[in-house]
Amino acid sequence: MEQYSPIVTETTFTITWKNYDGTVLETDTNVKKWTLPTYDGATPTKPDDTEYKYTFKGWDPEVKIATSDQVYTATFTSEKIISDEERYATKPIVSSDGKTIKYGLYPQTNVNDGTLVSTINALTSPESNGWYLHEGNYYAKAEAKPYKTTYTFDNGTPITKGETYWFRCEPIVWKVLSNKSGEYFILSSLLLDAHCFYNSSSDRTIDEKTIYANNYKYSDIRTWLNDEFYNSAFALGNNHIQLKAVDNSVGTTGGNNPTYVCEDTNDKVFLPSHKDYTTSSYGFSTGADTAISRYCKTTDWERARGSLSSSVGEDFPNQGAYLTRSPNSASFVAVWGVNTKGALRELRAYDKDSGVRPSISIKIS
């Protein structure tokens, strides 16, 4: 008697691969049960729109062994498209709550990506302000001269004296102190650099007048702010900055001694006065003693440049001491400053470890 073997039919399924919009990219028939389906076509794409660009991420649902007919749909990650205006803050960008404004660019955060550092180390053509452009981002380098050897960057890297580091140039965030019909008085929310008020304790004679070390009109910090800082921070856009008539009268100095008071100045960038830092409508404590409202954090760049920094508890790391434009009547080398605990105190004009917290007046129509 003739023997017959049973015919075994393999179970197979149809696997369909679709793009985000339902377009069929590939159809695989006869996919055997218990095997893992594979997509063999071109990588799925999704066109960028005005706000986002899209990159293929994977499939939904997650690809698993075949146990039934299945449709897989391509999924994508989205990345917000940043315009040059936003990336470089070439124009003022007001926050949704109106409390801060991004405007200008300055070195701030240490670059600790070894691959990126190797790449930008090879750059040889700096921009006019000394920064380097790589893949749409600006970088600046500096030889570290920390105030203390124990200082670190925000990423935890120790700051070693004499070593050269790279820093990413990022939009400056300004605190809005006042807004009068679109004319804003704004103050940097971080300490951006380290600089002395004047580089000597000696007085000098200009136009037959004795000029003391704490004279703001003839100070090194005023020159630096309106030259080097201004030309770097606003190299890509400065149309909104107003030339400001700066009041340097005795009433702005926190006292009534006119000995060291200088003439009013006209500036595009300037330091706030003692009076500014005790004005409640600007958000500051009216007293001169310790106040959180005057706390201000140092940037990585500023710490590397030699600024004093100190943590005030766990919640306020790397707070800095910074200059005002106001002379202190204690002596001809004394200026008012804000210490790391937010108190208005005497600083010496020639100290190079003072932080810089600039302010500007801008017009937004």
Protein language model regions, located:
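Signature tryptophan residues that serve as conserved aromatic anchors
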Residues: 17, 56-59, 174, 323
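Surface-exposed interfaces of beta-sheet-rich extracellular modules
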Residues: 11, 35-67
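Short structural boundary motif marking the start of a folded domain
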Residues: 11-16, 99
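Short, solvent-exposed loop/edge segments of extracellular or virion-exposed proteins
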Residues: 14-34
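Collagenous Gly-X-Y triple-helix signature in extracellular proteins
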Residues: 81-365
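Extracellular interaction modules
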Residues: 1-6, 60-79, 345-356
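Disulfide-stabilized cysteine-rich extracellular repeat microdomains
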Residues: 22, 30, 61-64, 79, ...
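Well-ordered beta-strand positions in beta-sheet-rich domains
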Residues: 27-30, 71-73, 171-173
